[in-house]
């Protein structure tokens, strides 16, 4: 189920100053909406180091490829898949990591990254 431009606009017109965060949205948002609102995406693939990890399930692809460094990013949302400017990144040594530990570390690092993002970019304090 993919919302169209009108559905996005109908919902978001009630929140013109909103900061929108995406977590596993997996849909392309129309350019008109991306340009009008502050939308950010958390992506569990280190696309600054491995651009081929854009798109779905990057953490699984990185694990299967045995990347020695893994991580996550927060980027501005554009109409292209994971094409927006990367604003924050965090990474870790994934050498010899188990898949179970990879999921745990990525979750922890992603949560930390969002907290740092809100503090730095949006001026939130303790």
Regions found by a protein language model. Name each.
Residues 1-126:
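One-carbon transfer enzymes
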């Amino acid at each position: 189920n993919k919302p169209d431009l009108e559905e996005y606009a109908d919902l978001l017109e009630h929140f013109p100053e909103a900061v929108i965060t995406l977590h596993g949205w997996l849909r392309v948002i129309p350019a008109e909406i991306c340009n009008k609102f502050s939308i950010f995406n958390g992506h569990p693939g280190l696309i600054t180091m491995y651009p081929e990890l854009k798109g779905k399930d990057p953490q699984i692809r990185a694990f299967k490829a045995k990347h020695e460094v893994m991580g996550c990013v927060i980027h501005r949302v554009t109409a292209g898949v994971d094409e927006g400017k990367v604003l924050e990144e965090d990474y870790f040594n994934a050498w010899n990591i188990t898949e179970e530990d990879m999921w745990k570390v990525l979750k922890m690092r992603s949560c930390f990254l969002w907290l740092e993002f809100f503090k730095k970019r949006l001026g939130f304090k303790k």
